[in-house]
Amino acid sequence: MSARWTTAVLDPQITGGLAVARSPDGFLVDANGALFPRDWLKRQDLDVLCEHGIGHFDGQPVFLLELRSATDVPGCSWRGLRAFMLEGDFDTYKVLGYAAQIGTWAREHRFCGSCGQAMTQIRWERAMYCQPCDLRSYPRISPSMIVLVTRGDEILLARSPRFVTGVYSTLAGFAEPGESAEDCLVREVREEVAVEVQNIQYVGSQCWPFPHSMMLGFHAEYAGGDIVMQPDEIEDAQWFSVHDLPPLPAGRSIARYLIDLYVARRLGLPEPVLPR
């Protein structure tokens, strides 16, 4: 079965297709969702900052209209990306997640970071170009590790002050320059909870467009140490039995997948599938 959504660099000069409109308030939606006939959308009174061709959905070309600000459109409203992640069609969420990352990049790279002059959009490549500096800027992707640390029937979960009240999750952190994903994992676990790990195994990955992370998921076994929480980063961290877990992250997140996968294997239950 072919994928409903595939990314591609499309020339905005071509006509027709579908389009999504994104503002600082989220994506424009109506009763049918966030994908609109492009010609209709461009006839609306929208404050367009730029337009990018981003791919194909069900065989139709898709474009992003990145807006300077939200505009009232009759019969429509604005909806944040996280709401699409939590519910509705996951293929549509993938379109919007990609669009959000391209929109963030386009908004933040209008001017050259070296000389300050306006950059131009390259039509055949996903890049912005500064001619005086001969410099190309590509969409930013931030590699991050996320790990479930286990000890038999116990899993190590923590909560950040930024989490929804009561929710516990796996440990995670951004990779530093010159650092492998495994080195990042060991360092982040040590920094956040002062625990050592062993037998690191890669599990899977997930795009996390909030705003531009690539989450690399791992499982690791406890090797030693007592939990000492990192100030300002970790509000609480505990070992939880797979039989008695606290409130967990959203079901479509890789954090939840890592937890559900381990619990299923310990309890002999059907294994979950990571949304991609």
UniProtKB/Swiss-Prot annotation:
The keyword NAD applies. CDD domains: NUDIX_NADH_pyrophosphatase_Nudt13 (cd03429). Its cofactor is Mg(2+); Mn(2+); Zn(2+). One of its GO terms (biological process) is NADP catabolic process. PROSITE patterns: NUDIX. Pfam families: NUDIX (PF00293), NUDIX-like (PF09296), Zn_ribbon_NUD (PF09297). A divalent metal cation 2 binds at residue 188. Residues 139-262 form the Nudix hydrolase domain. One of its GO terms (molecular function) is NAD+ diphosphatase activity. GO terms for cellular component: cytosol. A divalent metal cation 3 binds at residues 188, 192, 233. Its EC number is 3.6.1.-, 3.6.1.22. It catalyses: a 5'-end NAD(+)-phospho-ribonucleoside in mRNA + H2O = a 5'-end phospho-adenosine-phospho-ribonucleoside in mRNA + beta-nicotinamide D-ribonucleotide + 2 H(+); NAD(+) + H2O = beta-nicotinamide D-ribonucleotide + AMP + 2 H(+); NADH + H2O = reduced beta-nicotinamide D-ribonucleotide + AMP + 2 H(+). Homodimer. PANTHER family: NAD-CAPPED RNA HYDROLASE NUDT12, NUDIX HYDROLASE, NUDC SUBFAMILY. mRNA decapping enzyme that specifically removes the nicotinamide adenine dinucleotide (NAD) cap from a subset of mRNAs by hydrolyzing the diphosphate linkage to produce nicotinamide mononucleotide (NMN) and 5' monophosphate mRNA. The NAD-cap is present at the 5'-end of some mRNAs and stabilizes RNA against 5'-processing. Has preference for mRNAs with a 5'-end purine. Catalyzes the hydrolysis of a broad range of dinucleotide pyrophosphates. Belongs to the Nudix hydrolase family. NudC subfamily. This is NAD-capped RNA hydrolase NudC. It comes from Pseudomonas putida (strain GB-1). The lineage of its organism: Bacteria, Pseudomonadati, Pseudomonadota, Gammaproteobacteria, Pseudomonadales. The gene is nudC.
